[in-house]
């Protein structure tokens, strides 16, 4: 009897044990109004003339089969240029469960609703997405952050406004009770999903160059910087590692080559975080619908060896900006909480539609594809070294550029200098050096 009891206890412990893995999804942009089978003006898609799906040689045989068999699957799982429909959302969640039905936690870096939706479909889409994710992972700590399409209208984030009230009502199951007041006031909260780890969810829309609101404390909108430093102090005192998550990362947009944050807010952010270089392990963001990395060097004059801040930018679920749906699974060290590997999963929308089922595939294993020494984790220094290797290796850069769009087509305004340039001046300096070295 004692042996049986021990076996049962071991089984229970093993079921509840951490697996040192978490999922990261971003930019779902689910639209309850999306019917991509129609593909007309009513679905608000980007015009098909800019798509390049026929350029893929591996599509040719499937195209012939589709035409010969007259398969009614075109647009079934969405289209390049269109936001996420109901079937694509369901298939993404199904594949997430297939990859890991019991992750330690899930990071969601914002933008749940489709683009350009009126208020009614916008709120309906937000609610449906939250219910779908919670229904699939009812016992998993899900950690969201606010995207520019999570507020109405777009980028309209203020202190203590109706958007925050709506999002709290939609995300109440994920916001810790002791963080409700912070979320309702500024849209940020902190949570510790596993022992030794603090995750800080920032409302980065407050800092966006596209946020036209004025604030009573313009140097610190909604007091979020002061709040951030309080959380970093508490985490450091507790001996916890910190992940910072947000929607819009501080740095340069790869398409417009412009700052994503207003410059004074980016400076303030790095001034604060540079004092906690050994506490902050990584940052996770989204927004640009591309799988990218950033490694920005901290600048603390009191230190002789400033570290690099590693940022992992999530590619998107929606194929609206001509990419394949992608999500990632991160593996982390149980003690240091350093990231030790990343596995990305994608599905080719065009092939999925032609075959009539989603063709999910492991896109890459970060450590293997980039030959990373992860003995001490994948931190800012490792990402900076990878950037330096990209400069001298076309094959490494080409892999990175291909993965940016979920293995669709490279649209490369991408350049290696973007990885560790936080400002236009830094980008220009890096580009000048690279050109002269070459």
Curated annotation (Swiss-Prot):
Write out the residues that bind Zn(2+) 2: 111, 148, 247, 287
For the keyword Hydrolase, the answer is yes
Q: Which cofactor does it need?
A: Zn(2+)
From which domain of life does this come?
Answer: Eukaryota
- BP GO annotations: ceramide biosynthetic process; sphingomyelin catabolic process
Give the Gene Ontology MF terms in alphabetical order: hydrolase activity, acting on glycosyl bonds; metal ion binding; phosphoric diester hydrolase activity; sphingomyelin phosphodiesterase activity
Annotated positions binding Zn(2+) 1: 27, 29, 111, 289
List glycan-bearing residues. 40, 160, 271, 338, 359
Task: Tell me the cofactor note.
Answer: Binds 2 Zn(2+) per subunit.
Keywords, A to Z, come to: Glycoprotein, Glycosidase, Hydrolase, Metal-binding, Secreted, Signal, Zinc
> Which GO cellular component term is one of those annotated?
membrane
Question: Top enzyme class of this protein?
Answer: hydrolase
One matching Pfam family is ASMase_C
Q: What is this protein called?
A: Sphingomyelinase phosphodiesterase D
The record's gene field reads sgmD
């Amino acid at each position: 009897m004692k042996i049986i009891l021990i076996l049962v206890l071991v089984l229970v412990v093993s079921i509840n044990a951490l697996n040192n893995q978490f999922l990261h999804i971003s930019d779902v942009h689910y639209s309850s109004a999306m019917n991509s089978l129609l593909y007309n003006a009513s679905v608000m898609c980007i015009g098909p003339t800019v798509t390049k799906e026929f350029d893929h040689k591996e599509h040719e045989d499937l195209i012939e089969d589709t035409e010969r068999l007259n398969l009614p699957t075109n647009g079934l799982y969405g289209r390049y240029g269109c936001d996420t429909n109901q079937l694509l959302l369901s298939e993404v969640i199904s594949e997430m469960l297939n990859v890991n039905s019991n992750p330690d936690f899930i990071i969601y870096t914002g933008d749940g609703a489709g683009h350009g939706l009126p208020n009614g479909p916008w709120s309906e889409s937000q609610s449906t997405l939250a219910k779908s994710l919670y229904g699939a992972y009812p016992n998993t700590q899900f950690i969201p952050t606010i995207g520019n399409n999570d507020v109405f209208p777009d980028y309209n984030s203020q202190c203590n406004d109706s958007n925050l009230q709506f999002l709290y009502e939609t995300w109440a199951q994920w916001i810790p009770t002791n963080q409700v007041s912070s979320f309702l006031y500024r849209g940020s909260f902190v949570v510790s999903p596993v022992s030794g780890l603090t995750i800080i969810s920032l409302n980065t829309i407050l800092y966006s160059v596209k946020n036209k609101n004025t604030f009573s404390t313009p140097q610190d909108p909604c007091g979020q910087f002061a709040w951030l430093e309080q959380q970093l102090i508490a985490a450091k005192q507790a001996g916890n590692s910190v992940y910072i998550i947000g929607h819009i990362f501080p740095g340069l947009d790869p398409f417009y080559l412009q700052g994503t944050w207003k410059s004074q807010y980016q400076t303030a952010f790095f001034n604060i975080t540079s004092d906690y270089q050994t506490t902050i392990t990584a940052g996770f963001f989204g927004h640009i619908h591309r799988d990218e990395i950033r490694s920005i060097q901290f600048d603390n004059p009191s230190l002789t060896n400033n570290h690099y801040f590693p940022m992992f930018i999530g590619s998107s679920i929606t194929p609206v900006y001509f990419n394949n749906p992608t999500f990632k699974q991160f593996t982390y060290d149980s003690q240091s909480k350093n990231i030790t590997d990343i596995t990305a999963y994608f599905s080719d929308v065009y092939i999925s539609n032609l075959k009539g089922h989603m063709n999910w595939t492991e896109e890459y294993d970060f450590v293997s594809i980039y030959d990373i020494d992860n003995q001490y984790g994948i931190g800012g220094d490792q990402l900076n070294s990878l950037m330096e290797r990209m400069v001298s290796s076309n094959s490494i850069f080409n892999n990175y550029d291909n993965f940016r769009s979920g293995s669709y087509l490279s649209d490369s305004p991408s350049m290696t200098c973007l990885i560790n340039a936080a400002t236009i001046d830094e980008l220009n300096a890096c580009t000048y050096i690279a050109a002269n070295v070459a």
